[in-house]
Amino acid sequence: MQKILIGMLRTYQGSCLVNGIECKNRTKNFYENIGVDFEFSTMYEKLTARENLQFFSSLYEKKPRPIDELLEAVGLEQDADKRVADYSKGMKSRLNFIKALLHDPVLLCLDEPTSGLDPANSRMMKNMILEEKAKGKTILLTTHNMQDAAELCDRVAFIVNGKICALDSPHNLIMSKGAATVTYTWVENGEHRASCPLEQISSDERLKNLIAKNRLQSIHSSEPTLNDIFMDVTGRTLL
């Protein structure tokens, strides 16, 4: 899908419009409003980060965003003049991301943007994505990370064998799985476990009796996640 949207795949059935332009009939200015962040680095390894960004910004007619500000935003200002070949995978991912922001596009196509990042940099990346979203930009996120999808997306589509099998907001998809449940354990000639829907907890006589007699060993609640929806829709687990 992303290959069609960014004009890489020109042979397809049906219609696909980006900013009112049919993708197969793209013009010279088609990419002025599209930013693409592939999962794997598309940088020139022998150039520095700064040189790469200067080169790619020169390909657009629009005035680029300040390179130093973008580098600082992803924590690469101290390594701006280091060759990309010497960057770690996470550093390349961050550099790839800000390359997509250089020309301030209205459409961002992001492919696994947090892949290879530690928790701190992953959080930073997601905050930047949310900032771009708050500006009114359209963001197409391709990911197997269901936590990212739940945090970042207004709508989530599960695509199986080229077909959309489910499409809705993260909240609605999760609620379609069912309500949260409460699981509790107690000891009586061995350990026992039972569960009940959260909204029915007040009518669970066994649970009320265990609490009254101070015999409850543990209790916790859980609710469905997008991982559960993924497994239901696709019939397979996430790796």
Model-predicted regions and their roles:
Residues N172-L239:
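Short, charged/small-residue-rich alpha-helical element at the C-terminal edge
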Residues D37, F56, M128, G162, ...:
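Short, low-complexity, polar/charged sequence segments that are solvent-exposed and flexible
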Residues C165-L173:
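Charged, amphipathic alpha-helical segments
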